[in-house]
Amino acid sequence: MTKNHKLWGGRFESSLEKWVEEFGASISFDQKLAPYDMKASMAHVTMLGKTDIISQEEAGLIKDGLKILQDKYRAGQLTFSISNEDIHMNIESLLTAEIGEVAGKLHTARSRNDQVATDMHLYLKDKLQEMMKKLLHLRITLVNLAENHIYTVMPGYTHLQHAQPISFGHHLMAYYNMFTRDTERLEFNMKHTNLSPLGAAALAGTTFPIDRHMTTRLLDFEKPYSNSLDAVSDRDFIIEFLSNASILMMHLSRFCEEIINWCSYEYQFITLSDTFSTGSSIMPQKKNPDMAELIRGKTGRVYGNLFSLLTVMKSLPLAYNKDLQEDKEGMFDSVETVSIAIEIMANMLETMTVNEHIMMTSTETDFSNATELADYLASKGIPFRKAHEIVGKLVLECSKNGSYLQDIPLKYYQEISELIENDIYEILTAKTAVKRRNSLGGTGFDQVKKQILLARKELKAE
């Protein structure tokens, strides 16, 4: 066996087998942390110099070397090696090649345990901010679309059956509220992500007189972890993100399910842009909502990433264990999947065509006005339960003869109650049904306007 040349190889007489080395290496995926690793190292060496743990001259040389590596990384000129295992060892090896053995002083008062934790906090903090910006765009898109369709009437559904007519704008604002809650969850997630593990070292802190508050400020974290064991062992912030991402994807998936239905031949409520549709290799007429289907499908992989990390963490003793190498790929994958899904959804909504006439017509050939009739009868003094029974029988009779409630002659209605007047036919129209549901948060046009006004105030404040 050959001598071990790893940076940690002093304890070992021989090297890893190549296939074992490949199994243990993480550079294929954790290289995404490279810019964050160099940023954290820059803060760490600045602190080492200012606290005289290393000389100012040494700190300057290391910072100059890190700047060279940062420039090379941005230019796509850094090459990483599997023999260096992970991004931390690769950066240190590259730094040594640039400035010599003084690079070894960078790791003073630091372990890969607090190093990787710091990198992941920086990475996720960055990605949470990006994701919230994309959610803001999606929410603005929804509000704009809702405002354009306050008076667009469509069937509201329960059990996928026509229930009551609603404003399409009201339907869109329901999703605005969901994505607003998603934003709030990510904001709270940021609170737990915006902590600095740097300086916790392997698990117990360090004997060097480090200044953790200085590195916290330099990295723009809110505060340092107060317990070194927790600092290197904590992955709650990632699990919290994966949970939030799963809920967010669930909301996107529900919306996509409706979009897929709405653009089908059976509904024809909307027409998706060609930009977000594909065809068939055999059926020339097909226009498939593939992007909506993919968002729906990718929701499962985001759920899987959450379950995977929960399973990794469930039996881990304090502090660091190699199992934690498995915390990154799911996080990276969920960040990328959710981010592109939000972008696609916003652009898909901006470019789709709403077939208002078909939506409206769909409410005229159903019994979604049955509740309006029951409410009307109740307003005339008939107990609601009795009114419900009467309307149910009328619906049954109409279903048998192919007519609708609005087709029943006034004379027949007046046999139920002499108080029923000709205004019943206006009450039974879909637009009137929507307009009259003016309770707080309801689908009434005035209520939808209030929802939109409130949403615009919220968006302006962000």
UniProtKB/Swiss-Prot annotation:
Claim: Cell wall biogenesis/degradation is one of the keywords in the record: no
PROSITE patterns per UniProt: FUMARATE_LYASES (PS00163)
Pathway(s) served: Amino-acid biosynthesis; L-arginine biosynthesis; L-arginine from L-ornithine and carbamoyl phosphate: step 3/3
This enzyme's EC code(s): 4.3.2.1
Reaction catalysis annotation: 2-(N(omega)-L-arginino)succinate = fumarate + L-arginine
GO cellular component: cytosol
Keyword Lyase set for record: yes
Subcellular location: Cytoplasm
Example GO BP: L-arginine biosynthetic process
Stored InterPro entries: Arg_succ_lyase_C (IPR029419), Argininosuccinate_lyase (IPR009049), Fumarase/histidase_N (IPR024083), Fumarate_lyase_CS (IPR020557), Fumarate_lyase_fam (IPR000362), Fumarate_lyase_N (IPR022761), L-Aspartase-like (IPR008948)
GO MF, any single term: argininosuccinate lyase activity
A Pfam family of this chain: Lyase_1
Keywords (A to Z) from UniProt: Amino-acid biosynthesis, Arginine biosynthesis, Cytoplasm, Lyase
Enzyme class, spelled out: lyase
PANTHER family linked: ARGININOSUCCINATE LYASE
NCBIfam families in the record: argH (TIGR00838)
Protein known as: Argininosuccinate lyase
Designated gene of the protein: argH
